[in-house]
């Protein structure tokens, strides 16, 4: 039986996705390669989303365990101003 592949972490998945997008944006990939890259990009996106959802769940659980701590939403406009 082949050894199990160790899943790559979020940062590696995100870096791979960014590199893939950059390659595709150059516009010089053959159609078949573009389709394979797109499929890989979808898989990487789903993996990143799943990891983010798991991290959010873990943070929420930790906050709830601490008691009356209020959660505030992330303000993208405020972050962009930094």
UniProtKB/Swiss-Prot annotation:
GO terms for molecular function: exodeoxyribonuclease VII activity. Pfam families: Exonuc_VII_S. GO terms for biological process: DNA catabolic process. InterPro entries: Exonuc_VII_S, Exonuc_VII_ssu_sf. It catalyses: Exonucleolytic cleavage in either 5'- to 3'- or 3'- to 5'-direction to yield nucleoside 5'-phosphates. Keywords: Cytoplasm, Exonuclease, Hydrolase, Nuclease. GO terms for cellular component: cytosol; exodeoxyribonuclease VII complex. Its main location: cytoplasm. It is an enzyme of class 3 (hydrolase). It is found in: Cytoplasm. Its EC number is 3.1.11.6. Belongs to the XseB family. Bidirectionally degrades single-stranded DNA into large acid-insoluble oligonucleotides, which are then degraded further into small acid-soluble oligonucleotides. Heterooligomer composed of large and small subunits. This is Exodeoxyribonuclease 7 small subunit. It comes from Cellvibrio japonicus (strain Ueda107) (Pseudomonas fluorescens subsp. cellulosa).
